């Protein structure tokens, strides 16, 4: 997807969310990104609007890069939804469960393939995911 977001835009968003958390404006877990801004922007150059994105509880960057408006994302995070951000209209879904999004992404990919769709399915996970049986069953 073509984005006008810069690494600094992503960093600033996470810093703002961290500040809200430190000021007790968020009464739920948050998981912030740091250090991979250029890489994820590069990856999202290949993500199309019709593509699906699945990720874990650390999904703020993916949501922003998939087109979720900054203010809407911040509002949902402030409401305590940081680890379960789902925006079907933007085709982005996250799960608070390690490996929780992997089988769902796998099923979505199979459905898109069977429909003959041009949509791709992208699944972002952390390193602990590779230690779970569900990951290996789905990959």
Regions found by a protein language model. Give the residues of each.
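Cofactor-/ligand-binding subdomain signature composed of acidic, glycine-rich
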Residues: 1-29
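Cofactor-binding active-site loop characterized by glycine-rich and histidine/acidic residues
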Residues: 18, 24-139
């Amino acid at each position: 997807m073509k984005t006008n977001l810069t690494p600094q835009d992503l960093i600033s968003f996470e810093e703002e969310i961290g500040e809200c958390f430190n000021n007790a404006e968020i009464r739920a877990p948050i998981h912030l990104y740091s250090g991979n801004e250029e890489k994820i922007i590069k990856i999202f150059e290949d993500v199309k609007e019709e593509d699906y994105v699945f990720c874990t509880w650390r999904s703020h960057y993916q949501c922003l890069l998939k087109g979720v408006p900054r203010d809407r994302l911040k509002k949902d995070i402030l409401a305590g939804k940081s680890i379960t951000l789902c925006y079907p209209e933007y085709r982005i879904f996250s799960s608070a469960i390690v490996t929780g999004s992997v089988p769902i992404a796998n099923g979505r990919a199979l459905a898109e393939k069977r429909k003959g769709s041009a949509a791709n399915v992208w699944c972002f996970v952390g390193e602990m995911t590779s230690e779970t049986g569900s990951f290996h069953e789905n990959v």
